[in-house]
Amino acid sequence: MSTNKIKIATLQGKWTGDFESNNAWYVEQARALKGKGYDLVVLPELFHTPYFPFEENADFFDLAIEKDHPLVSQWQSIAKELNAVVVFPFFEKRARGIYHNSAFVFERDGSIAGLYRKSHIPDDPAFYEKYYFIPGDTGFEPIKTSAGTLGVLICWDQWFPEAARIMSLKGADVLIYPTAIGWMDSEPKEIYPRQQDSWMTVMRGHAIANRTFVIAANRGGTEGHLTFWGTSFAAAPDGYILEKCSPEFLGVSTVEIDLAETEENRRWWPHFRDRRIDLYSDILKIWCK
């Protein structure tokens, strides 16, 4: 079987305390990849801001940026500079009073290949995202790029198998999850590893069930009462962990994958062949009793 290898770089950083130095850190990490043959660069969720949804505060809407913001243009230029596809998550101001948790995908020439807006919006202690973000209206549409067809989803989307399945059925070669998740300091520390394991397990399950690759890019560091657990990782179509960062790691994690493995896996593990779509109508109900 022929090969289709791509090199992926995932950036795991922490909020530095101010916008200029924070963006400068990510720019420096990305530019260090220049000339090294990377095809895809993935940034964490809301990387350009602090994790502001830890509370409800109308002033934080000022952190949102529009599509023509200089930060967007800068990262389009970086994609061109690196000759790499870039997944660029951002706090999007779509219109007055309309805000999304979004991600652009930039092509190697800096053009916009596509846009995804986060579909599932949490509202939990320290994750009050419903106050800020309108659920996305882009649906689950893979984005075709020169680095493969990307199924971009964002953070809380990772807990919903339907999103991963639809992206895969529509041809995604890789499921990509920019993320901002961690522990609250009020939680008992003995449950920390269990939560982290659940997070990795659910995405490994998506890789296995759909026989596709998964890339998760989480942020690290501590912000107020939240400590983000990092642990960005790449999983193969059989769920095997190809690369994983430590919680404390700050920098670039790299992996090379062969997109042809998806086809090979689906021949040996034909989950899509054996689906019983005639039995699945109940999945569209809120509750089945």
What are these regions (language model features)?
Residues 3-8:
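Extreme N-terminal starter segment of soluble prokaryotic enzymes
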Residues 12-17:
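Short polar catalytic/cofactor-binding loops
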Residues 19, 28-109, 113-115, 181-205, ...:
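Cys-nucleophile CN-hydrolase/nitrilase-fold catalytic domain and related Cys-dependent amidase chemistry
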Residues 21-30, 160-165:
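Short, acidic/polar
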Residues 64-67, 94-187, 191-202, 264-273:
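Active-site catalytic loop in hydrolytic enzyme cores
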Residues 64-87, 155-252:
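CN hydrolase (nitrilase-like) catalytic-core segments centered on the catalytic cysteine
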Residues 88-90, 102-105, 141, 232-234, ...:
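Short beta-strand scaffold segments in enzyme catalytic cores
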Residues 260-289:
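A short C-terminal boundary segment appended to hydrolase-like catalytic domains
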